[in-house]
C-alpha cells in the first residue's frame, strides 16, 4: 500500500481574462505548466468515517481546509444519505507557499480526490472526478487532468500541450494574494477584458499575464521583486500572484541568475514537467490504471 503522494505546483505561462459569468466566475485563457516543486501528502485510510488533516508538525488543521472539503465531498458522493464506510488521516508536508499563484491548495485537493477515489474503492471515472473538482475550485480540474495544458472557460476546458523542457527561477514575495481578491481587483480597476483568441495564436505571440500591472500597482513588495528579477531576465507573474518567475533553457543559467539576487529575496529553482508525478505514480497501481486521465 502506498501512503505518500506528490502534489505538484504549477505556473501560468500566460493568463488572459476574457469575460465574466453571471455567477462571478471569470472566463480565461491560460497555459498551465506543471512543475516538479510541490507538496507531499501522506494518506492513511481508516474505517471510522472521520476525515482528519495534520501538518507535518502534527497540528490538526481547520475543517474548512480544501483537503478536508475534497475528502468530505468524495464521501458524500460515494455514500449519499448514509454514514461513510471509510475515512482518512491525512498528513500534509506543505512547501508550496499559500496565496502564491503556484496552485498549492488546488493541487492538494486533486491529490486527495484521486488517491481516495482509489483507496476507498470508489473508482469514479475521470468525468465525475472533474465535476467534483470544479465544485472545489477552478484550478482543481487541471491538477486532476495531470498534464501541462491550455485552458479555456473558467479553467475547466483543457487541451494537452507539450511544453519544451525549461528551468524556472521562482521568486516568493512575503505577501499572499488570494485568487478571489485578485479577480476583485481586476474588476475594481475597470480593466477591459482581453479578446478571445485561438490557442495557436496565443502560443505564437509573446506571453502576458493580465494581472501583472494590477498586482504591481497594489503590492509594493511584488513590484520590488519584479524589479530585482527584471534586471537579469524576463519576469512574469503566475496566476494572480504573488510569485514571479523567469524561464531558462538550462539549470545552470537559472542558478547563475539566482546568485545575482539580493540575499533577502526568497526564491527556488525547479524544472517544468508535462506529466504529473501523481499520475505517474497512480499508473503503477493496477486497479487505477484504467481510469487515469491520459485519454
UniProtKB/Swiss-Prot annotation:
Gene Ontology MF terms in the entry: 4-(cytidine 5'-diphospho)-2-C-methyl-D-erythritol kinase activity; ATP binding
Keywords on record: ATP-binding, Isoprene biosynthesis, Kinase, Nucleotide-binding, Transferase
Binding site for ATP: 97-107
Catalytic activity as recorded in UniProt: 4-CDP-2-C-methyl-D-erythritol + ATP = 4-CDP-2-C-methyl-D-erythritol 2-phosphate + ADP + H(+)
SUPFAM superfamilies: GHMP Kinase, C-terminal domain, Ribosomal protein S5 domain 2-like
Protein function: Catalyzes the phosphorylation of the position 2 hydroxy group of 4-diphosphocytidyl-2C-methyl-D-erythritol.
Family in the record: Belongs to the GHMP kinase family. IspE subfamily.
NCBIfam families (alphabetical): ispE (TIGR00154)
Complexes and interactors: Homodimer.
UniProt name for this protein: 4-diphosphocytidyl-2-C-methyl-D-erythritol kinase
Species per Swiss-Prot/TrEMBL record: Blochmanniella pennsylvanica (strain BPEN)
Taxon lineage: Bacteria, Pseudomonadati, Pseudomonadota, Gammaproteobacteria, Enterobacterales
